[in-house]
Amino acid sequence: VPDPAAFGEAYNAGQVLEVIDSARESLLIGQNERMIFNENADLIAAVPMYYYLDESLFAVCWKEVLEDRICSCCEIVVSDASQMRRKLSQDTYGSPVKAYATELAAQTNAVVAVNADLYLQRDLGITVYNRQLYRFNEWIYTGRYNQYNAIDTLLIDSAGNFNFMHMGEQRSREDVERYIEDHDILYSIAFGPVLVENGELQQYDWYPLGEINEEYSRAGIAQCGERHYFYMTVSFEDSRIPRCTINEFAQLMHLKGVKHAYALDGGQTGELVFNGQVYNRIDFDAERTVS
């Protein structure tokens, strides 16, 4: 359960840097660990920054203008990979019950929570939950792909590391089950595409999800280092500010210097919850129920 006294607000970058220094002194953040938060970024001063720091978790949320887009950002460092979890409605794969992200966050006492992939709404990709393979469909999709390999899938292992299975890669069910066992995969997310892999920017002409060539509200999650993560949305927060194609969003993630990054469901689904409150502006100014 989070410590209420560990939450705080900051109104300038210096205050956040002091919190980061405290996390370094406690050895939660390594002395040489490069942080995404940057005091030289074009921070939106009118919006408070929120942070959390205890002996096992650091998180900070802020908003900045990057390449003329308003980005809502969250950087997280945890001491143990088990602190990063996937929450399904009723903790049951396939549950028909839907809830708001704020409700799911409250059920798990989450410091930070984000929406992922609306897994019950689509049949594409590979779904793993609690080390068990639930979805691997070999039916033909568009005549070129199978449903399981029609998109990129993000798989997260017990060490908290990101692993990818890519669109078009041919695998059998047995291959995937062996991969899950060999890499101790805890769960997967099936949306995508991969935005950054091993520090390399990824760009696309076509992808079956996310209307990638349209200006759209975007959301993505990244791994920066060991148990070090970053989440960002680009939303319709100001009528004068454009949103992103997927290639533009990938470029924004790449500018942050992350190791791996993966697109999550955007639009009204793209949501960042900190300490029980929605931090970014959601499309239509209303949460969407998810599974």
Q: Whereabouts are the PLM-identified features?
A:
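Gly/Ser/Thr/Pro-rich low-complexity, intrinsically disordered segments
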Residues: V1-S291
